[in-house]
Structure formats: C-alpha cells, structure tokens
Regions:
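Short, surface-exposed glycine/acidic/tryptophan-bearing loops
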Residues: 96-149, 168
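A short alpha-helix/helix-coil micro-patch that ends at or immediately precedes a cysteine
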Residues: 51-112
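Bacterial signal peptide processing site
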Residues: 15-19
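Bacterial N-terminal signal peptides that target proteins for export
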Residues: 1-3
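Bacterial peptidoglycan biogenesis and beta-lactam-recognition machinery
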Residues: 81, 116, 164-166
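Disulfide-stabilized extracellular recognition modules
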Residues: 22-25, 137, 141-202
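Post-signal peptide N-terminal segment of mature Sec-exported envelope proteins
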Residues: 22-63, 69
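C-terminal motif of bacterial Sec signal peptides marking the signal peptidase cleavage site
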Residues: 10-13
Length: 202
C-alpha cells in the first residue's frame, strides 16, 4: 500500500539548529615511574563485532546510499509518471538529516501504533512534522509505503504510482530524507513502514 501528498508554497515556522563543538584541554599526568612492559602481546587487530544497528533503516545495508542512488538515477533519466504526466530530467536531491528526522518520527509512530496515513494520529500533517524537525521549507512533499521488504521494492512501488513518481521527479524538491521502521508487533498490518520527505528550503 502506498500514498503520496504534495504541498507547495505554504506557511511554515522557521526552525533552526546549531551544534556545539566539544573542547578538551586536559594535560596528561607526568609519571616518573617506568611502566612495565606487558608480557602478553596485545592483538593488533580488534575483535570483529557486528555493525551497529542504525535507527530508521530496517537494518537494510547501505540504506542511505542505495536510496540516493536510486532516487537520483530516476531524476537524471526523466520519467513518465502515468496520469501525473511526463517529467524531464531534473537535478539530484541531497540527503537532509532534518527531513530524515521528520520521516523517522512518522515511520516509527506508524510502526508502533499500527496505522498507515500521511496524518499522524494526533492530527499533525507531514508539513507540520517537517517544520517541527527544524526544516524551514518553501515546498514539501511526502511518500509513504508499507510492507515492502527492500529499498528496491519500495522504490519500484513509488516509481510505478503516478503521484509518488511525480513527487520523486519534482524539480521543486532539492532535499530528501527517508526512514523505514519494522512493525512493533507481529500483529501489525504491515511488516515495514516507509516515509520519504522531500522539500526545498525557504
């Protein structure tokens, strides 16, 4: 199941963000006692560990890069989007962490509460979620999907749906953020919940 929404030139509150650069100014203590040489050799290669799980990726490998590659290949080629029309090639979009935050919040909410809609159950629209994530937009759109197991499967579904395809091909959008969340329970309607937010800054 897939759904799309598009909103352009709406009003949105300006959100900002900043970062702190940590500073360190400690001086190591001076030792006058010699340190004994260890008798057990230290391995030069650390013990391999499993890669950390990254939230919002459904544990799919190369999630961000795979999505950007597929989205931008479609945009570079141009596309016929059925009843939404034919779109010429358009510039690539870039990954945006604020849009990803907005997308992830909604994907997680749908996965936890077992629903599928552009509107959150508390009434927030995708444009409100994007604004609340700190992205000041002049154009915004959203694609959602549920049940697709892979990046390729969800991109194929969006590509083959006129409204979703039109969002993917819109020259109005320059940034994208995507999230996938697994169902919170085996009783959920779908196994995975996908959200793609696209936008252009103000």
């Amino acid at each position: 199941m897939i759904a799309s929404a598009l909103l352009a030139l709406g009003l949105a509150a300006c959100g900002g963000g900043g970062g702190d650069t940590p500073a360190s100014g400690t001086t190591p203590p001076v030792s006058t006692t010699p340190t004994p040489t260890p008798t057990t050799p230290t391995p030069t290669d650390p013990t391999p560990t499993d890669p950390p799980t990254v939230a919002g990726t459904c544990d799919l490998p190369n999630f961000k890069q795979d999505l950007l590659t597929r989205i931008n290949a479609l945009r570079a080629a141009g596309a016929s989007c059925g009843s939404s029309g034919t779109f010429p090639a358009v510039p690539a979009v870039g990954w945006n962490d604020k849009l990803t935050t907005a997308a992830d919040g909604h994907a997680l909410d749908m996965a936890n509460k077992n629903y599928f809609s552009h509107d959150s159950q508390d009434g927030r629209s995708f444009s409100t979620r994007i604004t609340n994530a700190g992205y000041s937009w002049s154009a915004a759109g959203e694609n959602i999907a549920a049940g697709q197991p892979t990046v390729q499967a969800v991109m194929d579904a969006w590509r083959n749906s006129p409204g979703h395809c039109a969002n993917l091909m819109s020259a109005n959008f320059v940034d994208v953020g995507v999230s996938c969340r697994p169902a919170a329970s085996s009783s959920n309607t779908y196994s995975k919940y996908w959200v793609m937010d696209l936008a252009k800054p103000r």
